[in-house]
Amino acid sequence: MDFHKDILRIDCKSEVKRICSFIQQQVRALRREGILIGLSGGVDSAVSAAICVKALGKDKVFGLILPEKESNPVSSEYATKQAKELDIETETIDITPTLEAFGTYQKRDKVIREVFPEYDDGYKSKITLPADLLSRDAYNFFTLRIADGKGNIKSARLGKKTLNGIVAATDSKHRTRMMHLYYYAEMKKYLVCGTTNKTEIIQGFFVKYGDGGVDIEPLRHLYKTQVYQLAEYIGVINEIMERAPSPDTFSFQVSDEEFYFRIPYATLDLLLYAWEYNIPLKRVCETMNLTEEQVKRVTRDFAAKYNATKHLRQLPPTLE
């Protein structure tokens, strides 16, 4: 199979047409009257919304903007600006009260205080994986980092129980958003449009029954860098194009690369393609100017994440 640095270049005009046809077919097949989409202020939701408008028209696409008190303020700002560019109707709902009622922040903070007893409302927190996978080998252990707002940062490696507690609480943000999306979708008899791309799907970078709980996934076949190609072609606003991708679920801001992927998307996607299609190691090294050890290190990371997240990509098992 062929492999070169431009292997992921796509014909954007044809791809948009193909995705539009898919969206139209699904709306008809499922007898819905339009599309409902969560707008995060990121590139995936911006591209998805824009293509939905091309497929169905602006009057058949409704956007929900669902910030909470720890969201980056620019997320809502950019989502609103993109929606205005598309001329679609939106509604903004602060989900903080729902999260507080469930105990999202309290449950997470209780776990954090087991590591850092001083942690209170004046602090911010995030979790990250070891940086720069290409430069050094490291296990996928998560580190908790807290900032006191005075320039002081502390960090500690997380054990399994502590990590699970933080992730379980944080993932409730995604699941709360999906609850709101489906409420409005059922009211309007609309489909919920997902925004997860192929890079995220393969590596398990989504939340089961959260952002992964949708009716259609029009970007699931595209790597993240291909989504950016479509974004440029469609004319997504510059603020979103230039923004570093982020899960935007932690009070202490963190990028996708810091939190999970450990290498830039441009490198990640090419290596992921090579791993997925079993491109010979020597060819990958020559094309990307990497050593065999670097490529092996990254593919070990791919395999570990893929295997650990298989359940996210599967339907619930049944007897028959």
Regions found by a protein language model. Name each.
Residues M1-I37, I51-K54, D59-F62, E70, ...:
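ATP/NTP-dependent adenylation/nucleotidyl-transfer catalytic domains that generate, transfer
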Residues S45:
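Catalytic nucleophile loop
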Residues G42:
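Conserved G/P- and acidic residue-centered "switch" motifs that form tight phosphate/ATP-binding loops
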